[in-house]
Amino acid sequence: MARPAIPDEHAPDLRIVGPGELQALTELCRRCLPDPPDAEELSGTLFAGDRPALVRGDPAVGVVATEVEGDQGFVKLLCVDPKIQGNGLGHRLLAAAEADLAAAGATSVTIGADAPYFLYPGVETTQTAMISLLERHHYARVEANFNMEIDLGRIPPDPGGATVAALEEHDALDAWTAEHWPNWRLEVLRALGKGTLAVSREPGGDSGSGGDSGSGGGGYRSFCAYDVNRKGTLGPVAVRPDLMGKGAGVAALLHALHRMRAAGYAKAEVLWVGPVVPYARVGGRVNRVFFVYRRFLP
């Protein structure tokens, strides 16, 4: 089936878009997306100093943002103004993204699962137009991720035993997360810098000692980050491997949830959920499902 041609008046030059056009990008997302990121969230995801994305298009009508990690390419955002959807701009943007990623050495393109700085863990199942676009370009559905929602008015009491990590713990936390969860390292450090990283430690733990061993009273047990890439969201969350299944993550999780409630949030959305049980125990329920799509480049 032939793709519809985009009218000349809606055929923008697919140029590089920079942080100076952040407000226009934000307004485009408001028109396009059911859960649009605000300017701060877009800036932190697309224009992070340590991992900037390549944003291409025209923020008045449509853009695509890409990133390369080794030989893997990722599309972090693709949106087209609803007024001109169906005229071929989405196809042009996706083709431009593939060309940019191929030029950067990518052998595959993935939509979703683009940690550490991401807006969505995939394509939400309600986004029929986006799913159709990807299928027409022969993208395969490779996995599903989901979020859970927690009503902060009904969470259990904070049991104590967790605190907000201090900036002075940077090196200890960096080493700890790099050893066990390297894919979450940058998100953890971003949360640390924002003051949104709850950690629990071995009894008598010193905030600066870190490490895995509790013999000296300083080992970290778990962490729970929130407000990392999107406001009102929870994650990543992790428990020291030797303590998995022993309830060691409850203190950090509940401390983070109570801090979110104190900050004025009515609900928390847990992103890209792994195990369901820890969040179900504090009232969480699955509320959104996202598909991850991938295509290998020729």
Label each region the model flagged:
Residues V75-Q85, D114-P116, V237-G245, G274:
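A short, internal acetyl-CoA/4′-phosphopantetheine-binding micro-motif in the GNAT/acyltransferase core
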Residues M1-H10, L94-G160, F291-F296:
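Acyl-donor-binding surface of acyltransferase catalytic domains
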Residues P36-L54, G62-Q72, W181-P203, G216-P241:
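A conserved beta-strand-loop-helix scaffold within acyl/acetyltransferase catalytic domains
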Residues G86-A99, A103, V239, G245-H258, ...:
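Conserved acetyl-CoA-binding loop-helix of GNAT-fold acetyltransferases
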Residues A2-L42, N145-F146, I155-R185:
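Short amphipathic alpha-helix that is part of the acyltransferase structural core
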Residues V75, V109-G112, L234, A268-W272:
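Conserved hydrophobic beta-strand within the GNAT/NAT acetyltransferase core sheet
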